[in-house]
């Protein structure tokens, strides 16, 4: 199967969070891609929280309102997005997943629809990650 090549329009910048486990994991450990929305009033506040060491929360990727993507934690490390979690036989999903936060004010803060640009950017990133890590 040929590898998916991200579209040129997929802009990824680096802004690393200090919040991750320093133990490297191998590609085959990654079984899931988990999506979240930020649930915060502003994009800046969401990014600041993900970069704040005291918040103890992070993600691998953050999708901005304008559809730009920020890589916050390399996939080879566990970000802190799933907390104490379980799904089927898997526990502590951070160790087996890639976490993607999509900027959205959420249901507590006047929920807004995701833009078509955000959806397109998310789909491109998802296709790339599914191929790269053989996630089904």
Map each language-model feature to its residues.
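Active-site-adjacent loop/helix surface patches within enzyme catalytic domains
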Residues: 2-134
